[in-house]
Amino acid sequence: MTFASALTRYPIAHDAAAAAEIVAEFSDLDANLRLLLAGTAGCSPYLKGIMLKEAGWLREMLLNPPEISIAAAAHASTGLASEALGSALRQAKRRIALMVALADLGGIWPLAAVTGALTDFADLSVDLCVKALVADEIRRGKLPGAGAVDVATGAGMVVLAMGKMGAGELNYS
């Protein structure tokens, strides 16, 4: 299944100029994908900006189902040192926000899949940050009795998610 083959609906662009800019930028894509991208860009300056910033990646990822694209974006953040983690997570956040929005607006995913994907990425982000920061503190000798083997478990640190995060219902608000 490709992204285009799974589309069931398209948003109507509020800003025709923004939609036209995206149609021109992505003129090489399938007509249905252009409808989705144009409608999305014409309703969300934020998502339009991501489309333009991540155009090369987006073209490649639209050949796959959204699950594969989102997993690829999330995976790119794993195994990084704390110095590189922040920028990698910001890039992954942009990419995942865009793909989740397109899957939602294109009718590919139900609401539970949308909120689940956002929650899963938030969970991964917190996990990666805790482990990277714990690793830094272990290297600095600031966690007595903890060694490199303890990084995988966050040296026993617990992050408790409640509310929307705990219920797996994170959204864009």
Positions of predicted regions on the chain:
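Non-catalytic regulatory/linker segments of enzymes
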Residues: 1-173
